[in-house]
Amino acid sequence: MASFFARTRRFSLVSLFLLELFTINLIPTTDAQIGICYGMMGNNLPPANEVIALYKANNIKRMRLYDPNQPALNALRDSGIELILGIPNSDLQTLATNQDSARQWVQRNVLNFYPSVKIKYIAVGNEVSPVGGSSWLAQYVLPATQNVYQAIRAQGLHDQIKVTTAIDMTLIGNSFPPSKGSFRSDVRSYLDPFIGYLVYAGAPLLVNVYPYFSHIGNPRDISLPYALFTSPGVMVQDGPNGYQNLFDAMLDSVHAALDNTGIGWVNVVVSESGWPSDGGSATSYDNARIYLDNLIRHVGKGTPRRPWATEAYLFAMFDENQKSPELEKHFGVFYPNKQKKYPFGFGGERRDGEIVEGDFNGTVSLKSDM
């Protein structure tokens, strides 16, 4: 494993282009690429077995679990739901410095459940940044990931279960135009070796993408319709690619940043995206409904740079009354009483700028420590 980065070839721009063309034929273009993040920071939420029954009742086929919550893992047995299984940031140091701890973690939380629980990815940490409040943890992300990967590989499961991490958009230094996307220079020493690992392991990078926060951070230059997928036409022309919504522009800036490292081709999974219905600037029921509905129906189309279906996870399953600040309490797609907050669904048609309501059909992720 120590030689994985040395074995990663630097791709020319032509090689990257040809590899993306080849990959288009490998990635399924289905409309069932949506997940929903389910958090547990509330004192009025249903137990895990009822929540998973709610997924099944709504034909929800994917989930993100941010830590190995044992009641949830047990309830997931034979459910057919694909899972992103998370490792909390608090466990990174132990797993990075002790291979036996990584093997024990895999035995306890993966082998004890797989394959009756359909674990698809293991997310080693969430939003760790070498320049943020979690900077002291950055040194542990890659070695923890390598140790978990080695434990998975020893069981012959490295092709079935991909080991990765989740980042946020603060690691992007330039995002405009999207084709010029690049990572911040002060995070390259952290990210480049990790990207090399992803190329070696054939694993995707998980990225949390929130047009909401980009809009409220710069409402003068980023309009609300652009953030909500409701712009009447192309807002950003970037060479041959036209951008009518902010989500595509943000995601393609990540694609470009990865490509522009020259390390190799990496797929991206959107591990969080959402819009709060209350508690802050530009928050309303209608804004949240429109964003979520449009995102659900949009991801099957992909982005201008990568025009195949995007795997994405909405945030969040429930409104969580123990989160802060106030807007963080209002990202839910369902109320804590298990009633739908929004009537959106797949396959709807927009009429005169309105969202046509449809049956909910998506994917859920469990979030218990964020």
Swiss-Prot record:
The modification Pyrrolidone carboxylic acid is found at Q33. InterPro entries: Glyco_hydro_17, Glyco_hydro_17_plant, Glycoside_hydrolase_SF. It catalyses: Hydrolysis of (1->3)-beta-D-glucosidic linkages in (1->3)-beta-D-glucans. Keywords: Glycoprotein, Glycosidase, Hydrolase, Plant defense, Pyrrolidone carboxylic acid, Signal. It comes from the Eukaryota. One of its GO terms (molecular function) is glucan endo-1,3-beta-D-glucosidase activity. It is an enzyme of class 3 (hydrolase). The active site is at E127 (proton donor), E272 (nucleophile). GO terms for biological process: carbohydrate metabolic process; defense response. Residues 1-32 form the signal peptide. Its EC number is 3.2.1.39. Residues 348-370 form a propeptide. Pfam families: Glyco_hydro_17. The keyword Ligase does not apply. Induction: By fungal elicitors. Constitutively expressed in seedling roots. Glycans are attached at N361. Belongs to the glycosyl hydrolase 17 family. Implicated in the defense of plants against pathogens. This is Glucan endo-1,3-beta-glucosidase.
